Structure formats: C-alpha cells, structure tokens
Swiss-Prot record:
Organism taxonomic ancestry: Bacteria, Pseudomonadati, Pseudomonadota, Alphaproteobacteria, Hyphomicrobiales
Residues the UniProt record annotates as site (Important for tRNA non-discrimination): 33, 83
Protein name from the UniProt record: Aspartate--tRNA(Asp/Asn) ligase
UniProt KW keywords: Aminoacyl-tRNA synthetase, ATP-binding, Cytoplasm, Ligase, Nucleotide-binding, Protein biosynthesis
Reaction catalysed by this enzyme: tRNA(Asx) + L-aspartate + ATP = L-aspartyl-tRNA(Asx) + AMP + diphosphate
Encoding gene per record: aspS
Binding site for ATP: 221-223, 484, 536-539
Record InterPro entries: Aa-tRNA-synt_II (IPR004364), aa-tRNA-synth_II (IPR006195), aa-tRNA-synth_II/BPL/LPL (IPR045864), Asp-tRNA-ligase_1 (IPR004524), Asp-tRNA-ligase_1_N (IPR047089), Asp/Asn-tRNA-synth_IIb (IPR002312), AspRS_core (IPR047090), GAD-like_sf (IPR004115)
Family of the protein in this entry: Belongs to the class-II aminoacyl-tRNA synthetase family. Type 1 subfamily.
Function: Aspartyl-tRNA synthetase with relaxed tRNA specificity since it is able to aspartylate not only its cognate tRNA(Asp) but also tRNA(Asn). Reaction proceeds in two steps: L-aspartate is first activated by ATP to form Asp-AMP and then transferred to the acceptor end of tRNA(Asp/Asn).
Organism: Rhodopseudomonas palustris (strain BisB5)
Pfam families: GAD, tRNA-synt_2, tRNA_anti-codon
Region annotation (Aspartate) ranges: 199-202
Amino acid sequence: MHRYRTHTCGALRDSDIDQTVRLSGWCHRIRDHGGLLFIDLRDHYGLTQCVADPDSPAFKDAEKLRAEWVVRIDGRVRRRPEGTDNDDLPTGKIELFITEIEVLGPAGELPLPVFGEQEYPEDVRLRYRFLDLRREKLHQNIMTRGAIVDAMRARMKQQGFFEFQTPILTASSPEGARDFLVPSRIHPGKFYALPQAPQQYKQLLMMSGFDRYFQIAPCFRDEDPRADRLPGEFYQLDVEMSFVTQDDVFAAMEPVITGVFEDFAKGKRVTKGWPRIPYADSMRKYGTDKPDLRNPIEMQDVSEHFRGSGFKVFARMLEEERNQVWAIPGPGGGSRAFCDRMNSWAQGEGQPGLGYIMWREGGEGAGPLANNIGPERTEAIRAALGLKAGDAAFFVAGDPSKFVKFAGLARTKVGEELNLIDKDQFALAWVVDFPMYEYNEDDKKVDFSHNPFSMPQGGMDALLGQDPLTIKAFQYDITCNGFEIASGGIRNHRPEAMVKAFEIAGYGEQEVVDRFGGMYRAFQYGAPPHGGMAAGVDRIVMLLCGTNNLREISLFPMNQRAEDLLMGAPSQVTPKQLRELHIRLNLPEN
C-alpha cells in the first residue's frame, strides 16, 4: 500500500464498498454524535466522510484530532446508513470506517476557519493566505483561472499563433505609469525596469520575421492603488500579428475571447458578432469608453428642446456653443419617490441635483422641468426618447467634457435601481476610433491619449495637416459588462511617422532614439505593417468567476497599500546589499 494514499478524497464511490483503502488530507470538520466521531477529510480533489465508533481501534486517536490537522487514515469503505446520503458530494453514498490514524502535520489555533465561507478582514486573509486558499470558493477560483489560461492558449494555437517569452529585465520607458526599477550591480548608477508590457519586444518580434505571437505575460506597474487594479503586477494575453489591418486583428481575436467566455459562462449568454462602437458614440450614449451593454439605456442630446425654452438655467447654458443638455431615459421610473431619490443621489455625488420629467397616463409630463418648458417641448422629448406613461427622463447640462463621467454614472445608477441590467449575459463589444491625442490639463500640453505606438488614421498626412486633437488612431478596446478587458492597435511602423507622432506630444527625435533605440533602429531595416492587442487575464477571470474583487482570483496578491503581508514585502535590505549596488538611501524625514 502506498505510504500516504491509495485514493484521493474525491475518488471513492459505492463501487469501492468493502475495500480497504488509505486516504491523506486535512480534517475539514469534526463532529461528535453521541460517541460516534465523524471526520470530513479533505484534499484538493474532494471530501470523504470518515467515521470512528468506540469499538474502532483508532477511536482514541480520532478524539485528539482538530480542524486542519493533516492526517493519514486507513479504513474500510462502507455504504452510508439509509437516509444519510449526501447528494452534494460525489462521495456522498459511502463513508470510511477508520481502522488506523497517523498524524502527518498538526495545526495550531486557526486565525481564520477553513470550513464555511465566513467573511474575515482582508489583512487576515492575506497574511494567512495559505489557509485562505484552502477555502472552497477561493480554491475553485484559482483552479478556474488555470483552466481559463489553458483555454486561451489552446484557442490561440488554433488560430495559428506561436507562444514566445520576452525578457523581464528591460529598459525604462514612458508607457503611462511608473516603472519598477531594478538597480544594476555591474553598471553602477544604471537601472533595469520590469516591463509595464512587452510592447516593444512584441513589435520587435514582428520586425524579426515572426508572424503571429502571443504569451501570457506578467506586467509590472508602480501605480497608486485602485479598486479595479491589483498593485504591482498583473497578467495579460499579449498578442501581435504582421501584415494585418484592424479587421484582421478583430477576425483573429473575437473567436478566441468569445470561445473562452462560452467555455466558462455557466449558462449565461455570450455576445456573438460584437458591435463596433466608435469612441465618440460610446461617450455620448453611455458616458464611458467601457460601456455596460447589459444596460439598455442610451443617452441622447436633447439640447434643441431646451434652447430658448422657459427653463432659463438650461436655456442660458445653451447660449454657449460648447454646452449641451443630455437626457438619460428611465423606463418605469416615473414615480415622484424614485425621481427624488435620484436627485438626492446626484447631490451626494457632488452635483447640484438631477433634473427630471415624469410622464403620466395620457402622456402628460410632470415635474418642474415639464412645467417650465411646456407640453409641446415635453412631448417632443418623450417622442425622441421613445418613452411612455410611467417612464421618466433625467437631464444633465453643461460642457459634456465636464459632465460626461457623471452622466455615465447616472445611467448606470438608473439601470441598477430600475432592474434594467440583464445579469444573465456577457455583453462584449469593440470600442474603436479612439482619439490619438488629448489635452493634458495638468501639463498644459497635447499628449498621447492611449498607446503612443498606434498608427494615426490618415498616416503622415494627418500628423502634418490636422489639428492633433481631431486625429483618430487605429486603436481599439474590448469591453465586457462595464470593464475594459483588452486594448490594442495597429502600430505606427514608419520611423518618420513615429518621430512626428512623438514630436506632437512634446518628445524630440533624440529622446525617441534614447527611449526606444532598439525599436527605432529596427524601423530602419524594413518593418512590416503590424498590430495586436493585450487582454487582461485577471479581469476576464474575475468576470467569469462572478466576483468583483481581483484578490478573489489571484494566488498571493498584495493589499491596497502594495504590501505582501505573507512574505513581508517590501522589506528592508542589508547595508552590504546596498553597498554592492552603490545605493545610499535618502529617506523622507516623516
């Protein structure tokens, strides 16, 4: 017999009755039923009920066991007594009558229980992550993550992609966030950087004659903590292709992402034939560039119905050309209580309020706005929005660039409050035609809005002849249920166009050469047209596992203060290590 086990804790069935077997695992739960001891023994594969009565030679040993002790149990498989089957367990028809117990690893008092799914403070869960990972839901999430990554790999290979690994130690580059820097011992005063993404390397692969690349790539960004992003590191499905247009990238990747979602959707519908939404339309209709299309609400510009109207607040705003009035339809929201609740919510978001119109039976509009603009304009708004009796509409006004974020939040709030969001689907879409540049209010300059390596629509002619803020890029995102899950673009593969694109954003040619020397040199020796994307593995797994917390799908995540409480990172290093790196600390006084 094997030293530790003949079967796993999820393997035994009623076909094994009367066999003598050996199991090893953790004591998941121990119950004393009037002298009869039940031990639920758990391993990675499942759970088996083990039982000892006072006649068992192992009864005294069984009495000493405690939760999460690791034990080896020998015994005889028998049918559970009539009426005690557990249909929730694959092993639920049998139990193991214990004949021998060996303690392999006792456990101290537990800082958090493994049995059950009780909520515990996050810091406790992260400090004792090895216990947390034994809990059923988190353990299953990690296994699902592995299966999703396997599915991604398989589907990428079916599409003709080849997997390569790019370097982890690389050069620092301005890709939008701070780099994690690694000092060089051999080259005093110089630093490597951990890659924010394999962007330059994957483009260099295309210039090296490879055609279709992918990898599950670790990425590192020294960013301030955010609720929707783990500090430090994340993983992406990184992709690049040669001799492709934007449509070619879509044709290659849409089946991969759709297929992965269908594999793990657990009965939810998955969009087929994704819509392609221009960035400007997404912002106007949904108030965001990552729309949740499960929410049917689409906002509309209704400025014409308030221009010159009796509602002077909006009418005066509209005298300035840049200002607009947008309507947020609220199907079924035509009650005074709901409209007042939305108004209070808006005030809690720092707004002066949220104007509204309700429609009564017969189509009559009600509320302060309706009273001020009159029945004709009120009816025109109702018709434009496709609303009926019992519905409402909410209004935001001013400069859209200032109110668009709030309008998007209001659309989401209305959808949630009125139960309009279809929770039984994964609504996937492409968002396309992103602006190449944006105006940076902090630095008072034009800057890249997304990836600086994207091809401008119109190429060099656009860079030379257009207002930079009107140039669109061959740049695209994939969105799902309100999350951006992938981003990509067709690359700017001509060196003169690359230099001009960076010049517009305030980078001189020498800085481009210094920062991106390897790629810039490669452009001089025949660079193919190429493009690609990167999909966020963590976010995709989070959506498919049905959680809204990235820590619930990550093995050993940091907390929101970018600390690894289990390993004690970041940590101090010895003076000797600092001397070897020629580093002297200059710590803040406080």
